[in-house]
Amino acid sequence: MSKNFINLYTFAGVICSTYRLPLPRLLEPLSMVLVLTIGWIIFLSSFIPVHFLLKGHDKLRKNLERCLVELICSFFVASWTGVVKYHGPRPSMRPKQVFVANHTSMIDFIILEQMTAFAVIMQKHPGWVGLLQSTILESVGCIWFNRSEAKDREIVTKKLRDHVLGVDNNPLLIFPEGTCVNNHYTVMFKKGAFELGCSVCPVAIKYNKIFVDAFWNSKKQSFTMHLLQLMTSWAVVCDVWYLEPQNIRPGESPIEFAERVRDIISTRAGLKKVPWDGYLKYSRPSPKHRERKQQSFAESMLRRLEEK
């Protein structure tokens, strides 16, 4: 089953074409900011009363907050002129399942969130993104961690296990690569999502670079500038596949399970698997590690020369 979501600007484009209005003027960055501003006004004027006035009605409050988070994410996608095609059944809320996806940009979360209010595990960010994490996204059960804090790993692991067992919790979403990759490759998946003792639901995301490259290089560009780049492009075109749930096989280790799921996602999205650790983006290898690798490479080259 596939479902097309045509956002506000796609609809506006049809109107402009019908009535011969100047489409390029409509797509100016100011218009994109206006759409997002309207979205925030609608969201905040609804979210604040719901969050503070319905504290005694937890189930109703959670359902309304979930819908409002999906709404603001839809406005974000509309501000990029996003054209997203979803393939497969909509994710359901049930215990003992976790969704895993390849990771290109923080907008992956927004694109998936407009379809279903996932609780995501995410690195803590500074600035306005961090403010959203500690306020609005807390309402859907998102879990934060800090790569530099070793003790965070144990705390996060416990939170993950508790979350997947909850009946009324939002579906849990994890990006097991641990970093943004350029949507040509998939790097090694961390095993944490694959040792929770639950079903793993793969999600494959593939961007079409016809109008803009959705890859976010956090080392070179702030997320604010990344959003502005998307908002000043013609469109963000993307396909999302919700794939068949997978379970660990008898005798299969969590690492082997992770590799099998990575293979499923890579095949569906047309991405190349590479044996790289995404965390190397955030830390330099030690001199001893480099020396061992150099020594190993030199020995392999000498063996090849001797064979010739």
Residue ranges and their predicted role:
Residues 42-71, 75-80, 90-150, 210, ...:
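Catalytic core of membrane glycerolipid acyltransferases/transacylases, capturing the structured
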Residues 130-140, 170-171, 178, 182-260, ...:
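A cross-family acyltransferase "interaction/gating" segment
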